[in-house]
C-alpha cells in the first residue's frame, strides 16, 4: 500500500507544478499512476482508481499516439481539471486513512504483554 501512497503523492506534486493542466495530468498519469495494478490499490479507492484508469484510456489513438495521449488531447481543460482533482482526492483519502490507522490505540492486552516482557 505504501507504493500506491507514494505514487499518489508524486502525482499530486506533479499536478501542483506550473504548466498546462493537460501536460500535468499526462505527466502524473504516465510517470506515477499508469503502472499501478488495481489490486494493489486499497479496496476503498479501487473503484475510483479503475474509473480514472478507464477515463484516461477511453479514446481511440491516431497513428503515432497511444490511447492516453488521444484521450488527453480530446479532453477539455475542465475535464482534465476534474480528473486531476480525482487524483488529489484519492491521495487525501489515503492520507486520512493512514492517519486514522496510526491514531488507533493499542489494545490493552498488547500493553500488558509488553509490561510483562519488560519485567522479565
Predicted features along the sequence, with ranges:
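Amphipathic alpha-helical interaction modules
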Residues: 19-66
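Amphipathic alpha-helical binding modules
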Residues: 69-120
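Compositionally biased amphipathic helical and low-complexity segments enriched in hydrophobic
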Residues: 9, 15-16, 46, 63, ...
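Long, hydrophobic, amphipathic alpha-helical segments used as structural scaffolds
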Residues: 16-19, 23, 37-42, 91-106
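Short terminal alpha-helical segments
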Residues: 1-31, 87-88
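Non-transmembrane, amphipathic alpha-helical segments
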Residues: 7-13, 17, 37-44, 71-82
Amino acid at each position: 500500500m505504501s507504493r500506491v501512497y507514494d505514487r499518489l503523492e508524486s502525482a499530486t506534486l506533479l499536478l501542483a507544478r506550473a504548466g498546462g493542466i493537460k501536460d500535468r495530468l499526462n505527466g502524473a498519469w504516465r510517470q506515477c499512476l499508469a503502472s499501478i495494478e488495481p489490486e494493489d490499490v486499497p479496496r476503498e479507492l479501487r473503484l475510483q482508481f479503475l474509473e480514472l484508469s478507464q477515463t484516461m484510456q477511453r479514446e481511440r489513438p491516431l497513428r503515432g499516439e497511444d490511447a492516453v495521449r488521444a484521450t488527453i488531447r480530446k479532453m477539455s481543460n475542465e475535464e482534465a481539471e476534474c480528473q486531476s482533482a480525482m487524483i488529489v482526492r484519492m491521495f487525501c483519502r489515503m492520507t486520512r486513512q493512514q492517519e486514522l490507522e496510526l491514531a488507533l490505540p493499542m489494545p490493552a492486552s498488547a500493553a500488558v504483554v509488553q509490561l510483562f516482557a519488560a519485567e522479565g
